[in-house]
Every structure is written in C-alpha cells, then in structure tokens.
C-alpha cells in the first residue's frame, strides 16, 4: 500500500518474507513536482545477506533532459510498529543527477533485527517504510506541475520483478522546487538563490581567480557546478562527529567534479584534508575513550570486589578478637 500526504510517502510491503527478488521498487510518487520511487534490497544492495538496503531514487532518470539536477532533503524510516523510538532512520540532504540518481543506505537495518520474532519491524509479514522529501531546488523542468499533484493510494503485495538498478549508489540525497527565474540573482556570471548571494560574493572576494579557468557555458551546468561547490563547503563546516565516512567520500567526489569543471580550489582541497584528519582524530579519540571507559569500569568493579573482601576480613578479625565468655569456658 502506498499513501502520499504532505510530502510524506508511506509504503507498506505485504508478504515481505516471501520475496525472491533482489530489488523491490515502490510505485512512483510525486513530491515537489518531481517523480520519485523507493528501492528495497531485501538481502542487501551488495548481496551481503546481512543487511536490508533502502534507497530513494528519481523515477525514470533516463527520460530526463541532459544536465538535470535536483537538490532535496529526505528522511527514510523503516517503521517499528511496536515502538517508533526504535524505528530505523536515514536523514540527509543530497544532489540527485544523471551520475547519481539515487541515495540511501546499503546497511539500513540488520536482517537479524528486521526478522526478529516480535521485533516490531515485520508485523503480519508487512514492512512499513515512510519517506519524507523536501525538494529544495530543481535544475531542469519539473516532472509534474505541482498543482496536479494528488494524494495516491495503492495496494502493493510483494512480487517478483526484474529491474536493473545496479547504478544505484549506497548513500543519501535531497531536492528542491525550481525557483522562478526572477528569484535567481547573478554573481560573477553564476545564477544563485538570494539566500546564497552573500556567501558566493564572499567566495569571489577571497578567491578572485576561482572561476578563471571555468569551462562550462551552459547556465544550468554553471549553476549545478556552483551548487556542488556550495554543498562541499557546507559539508566541510559540519562538526566531525556528524560526518560519516560516506560523507567524506562524497566530498572527495564533489571536489573532483568542481576541479574538472575548472574551479581553482586548491585551498578547499587543503581544508578537506584538514577535515579528514580531524575526523580520523575524532574516531581514534572516541575509540580510545571507549577503551579507557571499559578499563575504568573493570577497575571500579575490582575496587568494589576488594572492598567487599576487606569487609569480610574485618568481620573475621572482629570475630577472632572476641573473648570467650564464662559460659563458653564452663
């Protein structure tokens, strides 16, 4: 069953355990004028057999015109029907494009936890998934005019399908509505949103040669490249503890993309290496903290054990020191 309300798509997969398919796609749904679909890999995207994989994908990306790109924030949830507190969630803000039309997690939930008896994720052999999508920006035309979007509901039992989704990447993504042209502003030949103007101006003031060798002339491609640059810088401003290793791999890819486009970003490459080092130090420090906490826990337990032994010995000494009474002697 699929139900779309207020940018939230709810998908209930029936007869989940009987699936023989490598990938199970949801029906298409429209949010922000863009067509989407969910992809579930019951035994994992890489056929690992130990985790379920879940992705959000732009529906039928091959039908879209060259240069299309969509920026969106999404939240994917595998619902625990006994307690929402232990539902599994994946939230991210990403760019969807021809190269990467889908984002999500290859290790969304361990299969042992998913199939656990009375675990709450599979109830009556039904798996409930909720996708919330907020489209931030669209480069290229919308799939569907937003006024034509309607609430849809479809019953979808598990069935075997043959679909080639090998191009789906194991990450996450986001999207946005296309602003009217009048809302875009020009900064050094790049069309940006009003909210981005001051930041982009600061970039050009501090790095005036950044676009000296920039090659693309198409305004949509120029805008896409600038958005990749801004997204990369936004990532680098995140606290290390909030960045995953996948985020850093994605940042590396974004850096390569903007460099190939002609942006001079040597300074940004150094910052990325600095963030990587901070992340490594954070992970190493976190591991050391856990190790020390375990050692301290063991030490405290030993202290408690020693204190208990000490009290026992004191009790024995007191007993030994007690004099015999007259009754004991007689």
Curated annotation (Swiss-Prot):
InterPro entries: MATH-CC_domain_protein, MATH/TRAF_dom, TRAF-like. It comes from the Eukaryota. Residues 6-133 form the MATH domain. Residues 263-314 form a coiled coil. Keywords: Coiled coil. The keyword Coiled coil applies. This is MATH domain and coiled-coil domain-containing protein At3g58210.
């Amino acid at each position: 069953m699929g139900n779309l309300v207020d940018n939230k798509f709810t998908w209930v997969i029936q007869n989940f355990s009987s699936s023989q398919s490598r990938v199970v796609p949801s029906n298409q749904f429209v949010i922000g004028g863009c067509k989407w679909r969910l992809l579930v890999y019951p035994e994992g995207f890489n056929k690992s057999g130990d985790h379920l994989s879940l992705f959000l994908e732009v529906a039928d990306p091959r039908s879209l015109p060259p240069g299309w790109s969509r920026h969106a924030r999404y939240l994917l949830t595998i619902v625990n029907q006994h307690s929402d507190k232990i539902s599994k969630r994946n939230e991210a803000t990403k760019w969807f494009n021809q190269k990467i039309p889908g984002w999500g997690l290859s290790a969304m939930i361990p299969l042992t936890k998913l199939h656990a008896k009375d675990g709450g994720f599979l109830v009556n052999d039904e798996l409930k998934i909720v996708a919330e999508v907020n489209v931030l920006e669209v480069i290229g035309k919308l799939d569907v005019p937003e006024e034509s979007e309607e609430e849809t509901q479809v019953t979808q039992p598990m069935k075997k399908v043959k679909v080639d989704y090998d191009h789906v990447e194991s990450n996450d993504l986001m999207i946005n509505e296309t602003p009217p042209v009048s809302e875009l502003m020009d900064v050094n030949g790049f069309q940006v949103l009003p909210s981005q103007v001051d930041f982009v101006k600061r970039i050009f003031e501090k790095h005036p040669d950044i676009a000296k060798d920039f090659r693309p002339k198409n305004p949509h491609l120029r805008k896409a490249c600038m958005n990749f640059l801004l997204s990369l810088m936004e990532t680098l401003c995140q606290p290390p503890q909030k960045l995953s290793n996948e985020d850093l791999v994605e940042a590396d890819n974004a850096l390569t993309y903007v460099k190939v486009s002609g942006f001079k970003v040597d300074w940004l490459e150094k910052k990325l290496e600095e963030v990587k080092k901070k992340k490594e130090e954070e992970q190493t420090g976190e591991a050391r903290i856990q190790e020390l906490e375990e050692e301290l826990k063991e030490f405290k337990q030993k202290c408690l054990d020693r204190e208990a032994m000490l009290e026992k010995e004191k009790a024995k000494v007191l007993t030994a020191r007690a004099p015999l009474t007259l009754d004991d002697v007689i």
